[in-house]
């Protein structure tokens, strides 16, 4: 399905090169790519959507300078949607520490010693460096018709994570580096991971406002009564959403295109 590749062949454009909407960014963009690959979607997507992603899906998500230069080449006159990171809370706070921590304002079930409350401002300061590259990327897309930043899906509940984390190399490697088995580590609570995700969404929205771009959040319909990602949208791994979630995003992008068309 790839039509164009970057100079090294590492990155590719999937879909029509003349598509009005260009989706790019990190690993959560894969759900849109998977959705646009469905036969029923290929026949019915209007306006057309193209996704710039890895040529080899198993080699990991995009992110280097060549990738963003390729996006710039493709962006002229397009509505560019950047799926920015979205896994910082999973990568940094999947496991509890000793002593246990929480965020101020988060309700935690406590057994024994109370967790140490961390101010929200401190968490925001911790995450901010993961957004700084946007200050370099956004100005290079000056020829785009519009730019929108989109965050990743809300977290999955503990019940799902416990079933699949034993097979996820990123997290088993963390455990190995600590000299323990991943099954011995305590996963942070749903309420804490959800609030960490909320901080990320707030930060991305703030950067969008500062950089003069649009912001598109997770569709509310994708979340359960507790705010977590609904089970019908789970990919098999710990952190990502599936093509059904991608279909929801495609619909949001169609609405977005109508709002920002020039």
Kindly give the residue locations of the regions a language model identified.
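Serine-esterase "nucleophile elbow" of acetyl-processing enzymes
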Residues: 1-57, 61, 69-73
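Conserved catalytic-core segments centered on acid/base and nucleophilic motifs
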Residues: 23-24, 138, 245
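Conserved alpha-helical elements of sugar-nucleotide-dependent glycosyltransferases
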Residues: 28, 32, 133, 200, ...
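Short linear interaction motifs
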Residues: 59-68, 127-131
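Short, surface-exposed amphipathic charged segments that create phosphate/polyanion-binding patches used
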Residues: 62-65, 230-236
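Alpha-helical cap/lid subdomain in secreted, periplasmic
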Residues: 74-231
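Histidine-centered active-site loop/cap adjacent to the catalytic His
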Residues: 232-262
